[in-house]
Each structure stands twice: as C-alpha cells, then as structure tokens.
Amino acid sequence: MAAAKLEDADALIDSVETFIFDCDGVIWKGDKLIDDGVPETLDLLRSKGKRLVFLTNNSTRSRKQYGSKFRTLGLTVDEEEIFSSSFAAAAYLQSIHFPKDKKVYVIGEEGIINELELAGFQCLGGPSDADKKIELTPGFYMEHDKDVGAVVVGFDRYFNYYKVQYGTLCIRENPGCLFIATSRDTVFQLNGVQEWAGGGSMVGAILGSTKQEPVVVGKPSTFMMDYIAKKFGITTSQICMVGDMLDTDILFGQNGGCKTLLVLSGVTSHEMLQSHNNSIHPDLYTNQISDLLAVKAATV
C-alpha cells in the first residue's frame, strides 16, 4: 500500500498525544538544523499540549551531551525527553538485572561509557582502546577479562582489530556473555555532507567472528518503545513516530503499533519510498517536519 502525502496536519496532530522524533535527518544534519522552521514546529506542538520525545540510534553521545547539542542549536529540550541508543544499552542491562559485579566491554564511543557508568555498571574498552594494536607474532596470546559479562557494540569512529578480537574473546570464552548492539544502522549522517558507514558495520564484524546474533536495543527493536510507553504511561496507538529512515524509524513505529510519518529531509528520497523494491510504507510522508506548521492556517 503506497504512503499518502501529508495534507491535513491538523488531523494528524489531533489524532495523537505524543510525537517521537528521530534526530539525524529530521531535526538536524551534522551540526545544523534541517530548516529554520524546526523550533517553531516544536513550539507549536508543545502549545497544543503534545508530549515530545527525541529518539536517536546514534550512541556516540549520552543524554546529557545530546541536551547540550539541542541547546547549542537553539532548541529547548529537557534531558528526560531524550532517548539515545547509548541510554538504551544501559536501560536494557538494568531491565535484565545485569549483575553489578560483572563488567561491560564497550566497542563504541564515550556516550555508551557515560550512560553505563551513570547506571552503575563497570566498563572497559571504548575510547581508551582507540589506539591499541595487536602484533600477530608467533605464539602471541591475547588476554581478556574473564569478568566481562556483556559486550556492547555501537558506532565507533576508532574501530580497530584489537577491539574486534577483545570483544570476540569475551563473547566466545566467557560463559553467558551477552552481545548487545545499540543499532544495526547501515548508514550514519556524521557531518551532513555525505552518508557514512553506520554502526551496523561494527556490529557485523563481531557477528561475523562470533556467529552470534546480538540483542538490538535501538530502532527498529521495540525495546525503547516499550520503555518510553511505560515511563510516560502512553498507549502506543496515541504515538506518532517521525523519522527519515524506513528500515529503522518507520519499522520501529510499525513494530510498536504507532502512527508513522516519514520525512524526506534525511536518508530516504521520494524515489526510494515509491520504489517497487521498498516493502516498508509509512502512514504518511512529507518533506520536513516544519510542514506540520500548516496547521497554523487552520487555527488563525
């Protein structure tokens, strides 16, 4: 079924109580807002009593760091409204009562380390392993910490062979060691200029060496949808998921039973949406989130 173009913003806004926004490609690209209408759009939705939630698969920052980015871009967003996949990793470990005497090896950046430590977990790896190398000399044996009970893999600009081997050893040799992925995104809009290989490439390397499927805590897994719905006491049918990626954002909304709105300001083009190869169809699509401002004309 082909997606319908957003024509009646008023009807959409009135039909839900919560909007969940993806960030990269929806709110911003790199370090710039998608368009000048973003702040006005968010203000309008708040003025109509809508709850706003911001959900990103980008694990490089913590919620606190994302709060700072929103402020830098001139947006007033409370830290409690922000949910990153780095936070999701920590929330997942809390939800399964991960033992506090066990450690977490991180293949990723400081956002994951910050959120895990904030939740009280012992971490190793992450940025501190960025420059480590392995010399494959005859007889070399690589040691690893036997107390690691989970390996968390996210987007990592400093990905290297040392991290692959260390994570692989933990998963293969530590009994019951978990393999957790913050996301399996194929692309990442790192600087707003071009698309870059996403966190899925790092996850794929560990999957390839361990032959173990990860537990995915970011979109399109419903873990964060369930978490957000429970935290705020929302029925998922009262949520509209707004995103720019079909296989993460829109699928996430569909998996969670939400309304879905695709914006064409990020990864997905109109041609990709309409392609016969595409099997994921949002309820509605539009060019950018400021198209929701069309509601103003009906309320004046």
Predicted regions and their residues:
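Asp-based, Mg2+/Mn2+-dependent phosphohydrolase catalytic module
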Residues: 1-23, 28-50, 59-80, 90-300
